[in-house]
Amino acid sequence: MDNHNEVPMSMSAPWASAARVTCLSLDAKCHRPCPSSISASASASGCASDSAAIATTKLRHIAYTQRCSSRLTMLMTVLLLLLPLSFTPAHSCGPGRGLGRRRERNLYPLVLKQTIPNLSEYQSGASGPLEGEIKRDSPKFKDLVPNYNRDILFRDEEGTGADRLMTKRCKEKLNVLAYSVMNEWPGVRLLVTESWDEDHQHGQESLHYEGRAVTIATSDREPSRYGMLARLAVEAGFDWVSYVSRRHIYCSVKSDSSISSHVHGCFTPESTALLESGITKPLSEIAIGDRVLSMGSNGQPVYSEVILFMDRNLEQMQNFVELHTDGGAVLTVTPAHLISVWHPERQQLDYVFADRVEELNYVLVRDPQTGELRPQRVVRVGSVRSKGVVAPLTREGTIVVNSVAASCYAVIDSQSLAHWGLAPMRILAMLQSWMPAKDQLRSSQTEGVVSRAEQQNGIHWYANALYKVKDYVLPKSWRHD
């Protein structure tokens, strides 16, 4: 939609030719007599009636052209509104029989005593270190949430409801697992025999005391199902799963405080973007309606409108990944954010999570002399903790930040799927642009006008909704967990 504002770039660039371009051209031609020829004929005859006929013909031609334009606009509007209805997201990524088609890959059950990942439970690659026991009088007790999912059976031997208490992340993964269990074995429900423990019935170092672990089984107590139950727990997103015995499965998760960088993808507020006017602005000052430098689907630089902020919080402390290139560019971004990576050996452009970009990989960086995107080698990958997060969304779904081309999306390992998921917001922005009050909702250089970007604080409701449902419709291999 923004391709008519492309910045000049050599079409011979390999990443431009490697990018897929889908074009839809509509050619409407009106076969009408040329008014100029009619006018010349009328002038030659000198007939007044012919002049009147010529004027009438011109008016009819103008009216016809306006009707053609109006009908074409109406047709395009209908097509844009109906296009999302022709897709069914569950068909491409449903994890179970209840959503879309069946899994294309086979899931193998765990064997007795097997753990996934094959690490210590307390390593950062698993559930992470202990943070301390939570008691009823502890300040952190308010962070535990009860789980009243009707698809889950809680044994609750103590009769205090303690087995229903857990961290938010544990509750989220447990609900996903309960859904998978019902899909895998109709009529069977998930059974939780232990969650948060306040009676010290486990070892001294147990995540049960923090509400980060659950002991589970199936409602029919059929041991032959437990290997697959463990596998389903892995797919549900538990950070550490152990087929600990023939009677139950043990699962645990990272602490809620340690996974904040995984729930969204953002840049630092002081990172900059280039506006169409030629001005470079910090992302903290970018507003809805600004047109910033992005990368089109054909790999070329293009200016695209900011339609919303998926996250914006200038006070939140966050962990970031720093990517340094041999040309001096530095991109600071959250670990789950998608970055465009160029593979010269395959002549292919991919999107990779920021924390999976390695040294010697190539990223696309804007050349200040030509304005073109050129590959630069990553020479160092570091980490930093900084204050503030900003995540603008453009119509293109990409943005050039600190001269480095990046996606606007995160968490989901597919640029195209993430872009499709935000299609309703692009359509909504298009409809809002047709409203008379459009200018009141956009940024303005006039004093006293406060942009919507300055009013937003936190995750956008639609982005938050997508994050909550992703575990139900996407396999774990597609997610940044």
From Swiss-Prot:
User: What gene is this protein a product of?
Assistant: hh
Which species? Drosophila persimilis (Fruit fly)
GO terms (molecular function) for this protein are: calcium ion binding; cholesterol-protein transferase activity; morphogen activity; patched binding; peptidase activity
The record's GO CC annotations read:
cytoplasm; extracellular space; nucleus; plasma membrane
Calcium listed as a keyword:
yes
What positions are marked as the site Cleavage?
G265, C266
- Family assignment? Belongs to the hedgehog family.
- InterPro entries cross-referenced by the UniProt entry: Hedgehog (IPR001657), Hedgehog_Hint (IPR001767), Hedgehog_sig/DD-Pept_Zn-bd_sf (IPR009045), Hedgehog_Signaling (IPR050387), Hedgehog_signalling_dom (IPR000320), Hint_dom_C (IPR003586), Hint_dom_N (IPR003587), Hint_dom_sf (IPR036844)
List the PROSITE patterns hit by this protein, alphabetically.
INTEIN_N_TER
Q: Which residues are annotated with the lipid modification Cholesterol glycine ester?
A: G265
The organism that produces this protein has a lineage beginning with: Eukaryota, Metazoa, Ecdysozoa, Arthropoda, Hexapoda
Residues binding Ca(2+) 1, per UniProt: E157, E158, D163, T193, E194
> Where is it mainly found?
nucleus
Q: What is this protein called?
A: Protein hedgehog
Q: Does the keyword Transferase apply?
A: yes
